[in-house]
A protein has these predicted regions:
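GNAT-family acyltransferases
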Residues: 1-111, 118
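Conserved acetyl-CoA-binding loop-helix of GNAT-fold acetyltransferases
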Residues: 113-116, 122-130
């Protein structure tokens, strides 16, 4: 099933493969596998798929706050997300920014965040995505 890895805009066409990773228990924020499916995320997407896709290309920021690991909520930054695809979902890369400055808030680790699912690592996908 493998084809050359490319970046694709998140869309319904690729959603089943993305959801398959969640069902498999892959935490797509930390890119670790867990013992159980990530049912909260699956349910959120199922409840409002339009909202899910809107958040992947959020040029203005705002919208619902982002819940941090410590339970606090922070402002959603403008961001663009691309999925890594080689015939199936293999990861994602996200670009974040604040308007009118190069600075990011202290809770944001950088302008670029990316990850590759565990079974697709060591193929150069992250390097190619960058």
């Amino acid at each position: 099933m493998s084809e050359e890895m490319k970046l694709v805009k998140p869309s319904v066409e690729y959603l089943d493969s993305y959801l398959g990773c969640l069902r498999r228990g892959v935490d797509l924020i930390r890119y670790r596998e867990s013992e159980t499916p990530l049912t909260n995320e699956i349910e959120e997407i199922s409840n409002d798929v339009t909202k899910f896709f809107k958040q992947t290309f959020n040029m203005t920021g705002g919208g619902e706050p982002v819940k941090m690991d410590d339970g606090t909520f922070v402002e959603r930054l403008p961001s663009i997300t691309w999925w890594l695809w080689d015939g199936e979902f293999c990861g994602r890369i996200q670009f974040r920014w604040q308007h009118n400055t190069v600075e990011l808030p202290p809770y944001c680790l950088g302008h670029i965040g990316y990850g590759v699912v565990p079974w697709k690592r060591n193929k150069g996908y992250a390097k190619k995505a960058l």
